[in-house]
Amino acid sequence: MTPLQQLAATIEARKGADPASSWTAKLLSKGPEKCAEKFGEEAVEAIIEAVKGDRDALTSEAADALYHLLVMCAARDVSLSDIEAELESRHGTSGLTEKANR
């Protein structure tokens, strides 16, 4: 299991947990909108570090953004497997072609 798969499994396991026992459970208990807001904040922080060129800070913020992306998706019952399947369906297709077909 990759670290991303492990993270997704942990997030999934926390969906029914007591919000007092887990940051993930607490975030999920606040609903999809709050999860989306938090993802947006973390994405902006990653963008800032990318612009600044701080590799270590970008790596850290990217990890935070990935975590919050998975939490946001879990809040809407979209799993990492769902995302991987979507990516697999796009494999071998030019990005320009894929975008034109939307």
From Swiss-Prot:
SUPFAM superfamilies: all-alpha NTP pyrophosphatases. Gene3D superfamilies: MazG-like. Pathway: Amino-acid biosynthesis; L-histidine biosynthesis; L-histidine from 5-phospho-alpha-D-ribose 1-diphosphate: step 2/9. CDD domains: NTP-PPase_HisIE_like. GO terms for molecular function: ATP binding; phosphoribosyl-ATP diphosphatase activity. Its EC number is 3.6.1.31. It is found in: Cytoplasm. It catalyses: 1-(5-phospho-beta-D-ribosyl)-ATP + H2O = 1-(5-phospho-beta-D-ribosyl)-5'-AMP + diphosphate + H(+). InterPro entries: HisE, PRib-ATP_PPHydrolase-like. GO terms for cellular component: cytoplasm. Keywords: Amino-acid biosynthesis, ATP-binding, Cytoplasm, Histidine biosynthesis, Hydrolase, Nucleotide-binding. Pfam families: PRA-PH. GO terms for biological process: L-histidine biosynthetic process. The keyword Nucleotide-binding applies. It is an enzyme of class 3 (hydrolase). Belongs to the PRA-PH family. This is Phosphoribosyl-ATP pyrophosphatase. It comes from Jannaschia sp. (strain CCS1). The gene is hisE.
